[in-house]
């Protein structure tokens, strides 16, 4: 039986590299987002999250703290670990971390293919669909 993932806020260079590996596999490799779009000027100010199973990086996300909002970004789970509830666990961890830092309003740019996933977790779609990294997205928000 496979171990369950553990999630933590990145505190070391090694953990940050692991988070970037996950993001590179998912966004640059699978979705063909350019490296220049994937890694941006907000990296240094973001709270990065890493998910691992037995030391293997399987998931990553980042949170940017923007005024009253915690913006969840770069949510990624490697393909072979999807459909096991790990994305939901990653999202819960990210929301809990933002709450721990005093935030109760959350937003994200959801890929339209993932809108139902975020809606299941209490996010509501707002506005029109827009392109980000050549992928259709929609703003989604949640309070509490």
How would you label these PLM feature ranges?
Residues 65-73, 82, 132-137:
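A conserved beta-turn-beta hairpin within the catalytic core of GNAT-like acetyltransferases
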Residues 107-109, 119, 124-139:
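Conserved catalytic-core motifs of GNAT/GCN5-like acyltransferases
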């Amino acid at each position: 039986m496979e171990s369950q993932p553990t999630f933590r806020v990145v505190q070391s260079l090694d953990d940050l590299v692991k988070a970037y590996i996950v993001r590179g596999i998912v966004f640059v490799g699978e979705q063909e987002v350019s490296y220049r779009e994937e890694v941006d000027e907000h990296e240094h100010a973001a709270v990065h999250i890493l998910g691992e199973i037995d030391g293997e990086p399987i998931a990553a996300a980042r949170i940017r703290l923007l005024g009253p909002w915690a913006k969840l970004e770069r949510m990624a789970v490697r393909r072979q670990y999807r459909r096991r509830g790990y994305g939901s666990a990653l999202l819960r961890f990210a929301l809990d971390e933002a709450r721990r830092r005093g935030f109760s309003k959350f937003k994200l740019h959801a890929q339209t293919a993932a809108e139902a996933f975020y809606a299941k977790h209490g996010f509501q779609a707002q506005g029109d669909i827009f392109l980000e990294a050549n992928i259709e997205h929609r703003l989604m928000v949640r309070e509490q």
